[in-house]
Every structure is written in C-alpha cells, then in structure tokens.
C-alpha cells in the first residue's frame, strides 16, 4: 500500500479515519514482527505506515479544532 494522500484523508469521515489508524497500527505490528524474524523485504513500508498514522491524526485534529 502506497502512502496515503492528504486529499484522500481529508475526504474521510472521522470514523473512517479511526478505522484507517487501527488498520495501520495492525500493519505496523505485523511489519515489526516480520523485521524481527528477518522476513521483511520492504523496510520503507514501516516508515510510510508510521507517517500515514501521523498524517491521519494531524488532519483529524485540524478538523476537530475547526469545528470549535
């Protein structure tokens, strides 16, 4: 899965953002496990997943603050 685009994230509802973060956290767990066992081929995906989570959380906070 490629890095998520900001425009795609902004189009998500808050529930979709929560689901996306949960899925990315599961993916990060699996990637860490693969790295530990020496099975991870695409090491850059760990960085992408971490940054996708941060990107989603940042946009969610911006939306939440904009409502106030």
Curated annotation (Swiss-Prot):
Organism: Nitrobacter hamburgensis (strain DSM 10229 / NCIMB 13809 / X14)
Cysteine disulfide links: none
GO biological process: translation
Domain of life: Bacteria
Protein name, per record: Large ribosomal subunit protein uL29
GO MF entries: structural constituent of ribosome
One Gene Ontology cellular component annotation held by this UniProt entry: cytosolic large ribosomal subunit
Keywords on record: Ribonucleoprotein, Ribosomal protein
Keyword Endoplasmic reticulum: no
Matching InterPro entries: Ribosomal_protein_uL29 (IPR050063), Ribosomal_uL29 (IPR001854), Ribosomal_uL29_CS (IPR018254), Ribosomal_uL29_sf (IPR036049)
Family per similarity comment: Belongs to the universal ribosomal protein uL29 family.
């Amino acid at each position: 899965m490629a890095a998520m685009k900001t425009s795609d994230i902004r189009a998500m509802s808050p529930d979709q953002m929560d689901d996306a973060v949960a899925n990315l956290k599961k993916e990060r767990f699996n990637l860490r496990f693969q790295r530990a066992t020496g099975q991870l081929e695409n090491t850059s995906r760990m960085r992408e997943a971490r940054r996708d989570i941060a990107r989603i959380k940042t946009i969610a906070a911006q939306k939440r603050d904009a409502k106030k």
